[in-house]
Regions:
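Sec-dependent N-terminal signal peptides
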Residues: 3-13
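N-terminal signal peptide
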Residues: 13-21
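A short beta-strand-turn-helix
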Residues: 24-44, 66
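Short active-site neighborhood of thiol/selenol oxidoreductases, capturing the structured segment around
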Residues: 37-60, 77-80
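Loop/turn elements at helix/coil->beta-strand transitions in domains of secreted/extracellular proteins
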Residues: 40-44, 72-76, 103-108, 146, ...
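Structural microenvironment flanking redox-active thiols in thiol-disulfide oxidoreductases
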Residues: 57-123
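Thiol-/selenol-based redox modules, centered on thioredoxin-like
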Residues: 125-128, 132-180
């Protein structure tokens, strides 16, 4: 009985949040802003990007690109360089060139965003929603390093958070993408 009551409360609690991924917009690295409402009816994965060109960073970007290509019709990937992880506007052109050499144009690359909770009022509204259970209704997980992944269903509701150690090409990511 307690389990049933808990499940009913959890479902009610998660349904009572009206905001979704589709309520936000982000600045695009190549210029302009993109409303995320254009991704309704697609799953979306938001990933914080590495900022240093290393073999492991190249491997991560390659895996991200491979994942996006494999799920091109039902998944949109939004890649985010984080200010707290070291992004500066002076790096923008070099980073854009590096990212685009590894990532296809079907992956949206944002301009640098404040992603960490520690940024307080500077935290981008999208990441304030992604990282706070008071806003998204389910998860309270900070994006405190490159490689964090937030997955939203086609209705724009957050349903999974994967840390930087979860490999893009792993079976667990495939299971997460098949859920919801």
């Amino acid at each position: 009985m307690k389990i049933i009551l808990f499940n009913i409360i959890a479902v009610y609690y998660s349904l009572s949040f009206n905001s979704s991924l589709h309520d936000f917009s982000v600045p695009v690295m190549e210029g302009g802003n993109r409303s995320l409402s254009v991704y309704s009816n697609k799953k979306v994965m938001i990933v914080t990007l590495p900022l240093q060109q290393t073999a492991s960073a190249d491997s991560m970007l390659y895996s991200l690109d491979t994942l996006a290509t494999a799920h091109i019709y039902n998944l949109k990937i939004i890649a985010v360089p984080s200010v707290e992880d070291g992004y500066t506007s002076e790096q923008k052109n070099d980073l854009m060139q590096w990212y685009r050499s590894k990532l296809d144009t079907n992956i949206l690359i944002t301009d640098g965003l404040y992603t960490h909770k520690s940024s307080g009022n500077q935290q981008h509204p999208l990441f304030n929603w992604l990282t706070n259970d008071n806003n998204n209704g389910i998860f309270n997980v900070d994006a405190d390093s490159p490689g964090f992944k937030y997955v939203c269903n086609s209705a724009g509701k957050l349903y999974a958070v994967l840390n930087q150690h979860t490999k893009m090409h792993g079976s667990f990511v495939q299971k997460v993408l098949k859920a919801q």
